[in-house]
Amino acid sequence: MYKKVVGGWFVYLVSTQISSGRAGSARFGGHLGYPSPSVAYIMARASRKANGSKAKSNSVQEYLDLISLQKQQFDQMRANYSHQNTQLAKSNSMLMIKITDLETKISELVQENVQLRSRLSVTELRFKERLNQSFNLLEHGAFQRFDEIVNLFAVVRAQQGLRPESAAATEQAQRRFKGLEQRGVSPKVVGFDVPSSDSVRGERETLDDRAQQHQEADSMELNVEETQPLRKKRRRSSRRESLFIPSDFDFSNDSLENALKEADKSRSAKDEAPSVAEDTITEEKHRESASRTTEQGESESRTKEASGTLTQSNEDGMGNDKSLQKEGTQQEDAANFTHSIIEYFIPEEYDVGSSDVANTSKSKLEVYRDDNEIESSQSTSSGECKELTGELSSAQPPFVQIPASSQSKIKHSLKPPRTSQRKIVVDEVMPHNDYSDATRPRRTRGKAVDYKWPSLRAKMRRPTDKLVDATTVTDIHELQVPTNRKLRKQREGVADSADVHGETDHEQDPEQSPAAEDVSVGLQSINSNIQKDEVSDQPLQATEVTQALPEDLPLRQPMALKDITNKIHIVQKPKKSLAKKPIIGDVSDENSYYGDDTSASGLRLNEGDLSVFDLIGGVKCSNIPKTHRARAKAERQVGKKPAFKVST
């Protein structure tokens, strides 16, 4: 009973029932009055046990409820955490994907940045190289121009017999120029060197030395090295190169050469430093001067002859003093000539420099001028040359002319445009209907087109109203092939009627071309042959058509090209109709195989007579059986019928 305890109330009921039963049994057992003490003790003990078990069961139940509640909370928290973990995993995966995309994009951007930097560096390097080249070119050109000016001054000094500049200053200038040429690359930073006191003193001393040398120069003597041709400098412009050729103005005189040789012997011991001309002499110029010695020899012979003719009248009463004066006058003439030539060429250099476009690149631009400007410049230059020669010839004896070989070497960059190589473009003109033989400018670029007669396409095809040549003379409708039979027959009839009436048309139109006459004659002969072959019973179709046509409709005359473009429509012979009285029973007739095969109408002798088969009614003609079996069957069904043949 105590093992199956559910609650406190059930235990209490059981204990009360037991106690009541025992009391009854004691009563009924003969014991009346109060119960015995043993029963009370048992009841008290049972009540105590029931209270203890009740308290224990309550505590266990509360513990179990608490455990179940904690378990539920734990499961719920675990589910929440698992769901949160899945969401975090998803977000983490998305973030990782985005991070990888960002990494790829960053790597692409880095590569692009590297490429852009490399391109930028390459472009900067190229720009610096171009800038450096342009600066080097400008510097080289500027120094070259200054060098040309210095050389020009030196040549003028040498020609005039002046003493040149000191050798130390010229060497210093040449060293500077050579140093700049060897350096090649201009410095990025321009530095200004402050001269020291020692350098200033040295320059002052050199200036004092120059002044003393100029004061000590008593005689104006020419040096052999100075008169020799200068080194042919490398110039950018061939026109500048052609302006002044010093070797062309070297005048060889025996007396002058002897005087120069003596002066050279006297001054060879004094001058230790080389002059400017010695540094500029090259082997190329020596070769050119050697090649020009022959030309100079001819010029010397001419000058000797000219001077001999002038001085023959004065040689009789003159002595050594006259010869010395003659040599002096020749020197003065040569100097004046060179001076005039230099003065003549210097303004031309200025004009060319001012008029031409500045060329910064190495390649030479081709500058073209108009013919009027070229002719005016040539006329002015020839006028100036004539004025110079007139002045010199009037005041001085004739001098040596410049040889033709040196003039042929002069190069000119300003050339007129070549008009012979250009294509002459002629405006195009539309063709006219009148086929005149007058010449007119053609528009075609390749070959001439003849518009007089229709092209081969118009002859070979059947054109329509849309596809017609613009210059065709023939009628399109005559070349067409009509699909309608009525129109075709009508046109054939019109053509035949035109052929029939060709004689009248020919008489009416006396101005017709001979080609049209020949065509009409040929057509008439053909039509006459056709008419002979036709049956006399059938009337002509052409006359019927011409009668059916209205009078106002003009007939088409035969064209000149009708025999070329059109085919002659030959009228076919009509099929002969069966005669009214045919010959029946002809042995040679192909159609009469058996008498029963012929039709009833074919056996009539006359239209009004009765035929043989009219007498026999219900007889039908059948085809001839081809096989023996079919023929026997036919004979069995229908008795044998003799072939009715009419003998003639």
From Swiss-Prot:
Top-rank taxon of the source lineage equals Eukaryota
Basic and acidic residues: bias regions: 200-217, 262-273, 424-440, 490-509
**One Pfam short name:** Shugoshin_N
Query: Which locations, inside or outside the cell, does it occupy?
Result: Nucleus; Chromosome, Centromere
Q: Name one GO biological process term.
A: cell division
Q: Which InterPro entries match?
A: Shugoshin_C, Shugoshin_N
Protein's name in the database: Shugoshin
List the source organism: Eremothecium gossypii (strain ATCC 10895 / CBS 109.51 / FGSC 9923 / NRRL Y-1056) (Yeast)
